[in-house]
Each structure stands twice: as structure tokens, then as C-alpha cells.
């Protein structure tokens, strides 16, 4: 999905809070991504996966979408 500005992207990310997400940390075509839950804590976005919490800056993500 393409966004015309950062505001749209930020609103999309906010809509994913509390949901399971599929995210990628590389642009490798063979990377199938990881599944986690996007949470918000003290104003920070955290991805929880297998009981671990990852604090990841949005610019570090190559892809993020709701996992279905």
C-alpha cells in the first residue's frame, strides 16, 4: 500500500496497535517476515513476539501489515 504522506502512514500504524502483524526487517525477497503483536507502551511502539518485546523504529521496518 502506498501512502501520499506521513500522516496517512502514521494513522495506518496506529490502527494496527493491539493486532497481530506481519513485519519484515530486510528487503530480501526470500524474507517471509515475522509475526508479532504491535503494542503501545509509554508512547513507544513495541512488537511483542514469543514473549519478547522488540522496540523497533519505524524506519527500520521494510514492511508491516495486519496478519490474517
Predicted stretch roles:
Residues 1-32, 41-42, 46, 50-68:
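Short glycine-rich, low-complexity segments
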Residues 36-38:
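Conserved glycine-centered beta-strand/turn positions repeated across beta-sheet architectures
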